[in-house]
């Protein structure tokens, strides 16, 4: 399923002046991303502002993207939350949508469950989903995180086949070593080269909204064994990747996409657009 899929974009959700999903802008953005290296999309994930999307909006958004993209890219729909029952119902609904290839589920935030609780949570989602589940380990946002041992245990489930791992290259390496036939993606753009060199499958990216061509070149260089060129590209990209998280994401990437005419800067509360001073600072970081 993930063979040859290196660059997956965690796509933003654009909004109109009335705070509705801007499907016209989204349609144009999708085509742009497909033409600039994106081989897949995570729909309504963190970058897609999932916490402020209703369940109905998530279903509608997923259907729209799935219909437009069809079989041109891998599509992962986000069903995760800190409520297992709600996640199960979301997985059931989203996995039935045509052209959806997989379901993303995040470690439960705020509740602070044990490892055993998280394992039970993910197994319940996987049991309910009609499509394979990708785990999402991001303790920087959720407080709790899966251990390598828990990931390896979950990888034995017949309907769990991948993880978006944001912790460290060491975690990526250990999961690759311990889980056969299990795709390990980094969720940190700046770890693209290091994660790939230890056996990672690729990157689930925010930066690919703006630097898709360069990231595609990076993967091409690595796949060709041209490590000096890969290193050069990663050195160029890393400060720009980090700059996109200088303020609450996805605000910076939406700001830059708005400058290019793809979307409005709009984000949903409690996120707010960047101030003029913050925009100036962001541009300084991106130009270093």
From Swiss-Prot:
Q: What is its main location?
A: cytoplasm
Its organism's taxonomic lineage begins at:
Bacteria, Bacillati, Bacillota, Bacilli, Lactobacillales
**Any idea what this protein is called?**
4-hydroxy-tetrahydrodipicolinate synthase
Annotated residues for binding of pyruvate: 47, 204
- Where does this protein come from, organism-wise? Leuconostoc mesenteroides subsp. mesenteroides (strain ATCC 8293 / DSM 20343 / BCRC 11652 / CCM 1803 / JCM 6124 / NCDO 523 / NBRC 100496 / NCIMB 8023 / NCTC 12954 / NRRL B-1118 / 37Y)
SUPFAM superfamilies (alphabetical) = Aldolase
Example of a GO biological process term: diaminopimelate biosynthetic process
What gene is behind this protein?
Answer: dapA
Instruction: Give me the segments passing through the membrane.
Output: none
* Keywords for the protein's UniProt record, in alphabetical order: Amino-acid biosynthesis, Cytoplasm, Diaminopimelate biosynthesis, Lyase, Lysine biosynthesis, Schiff base
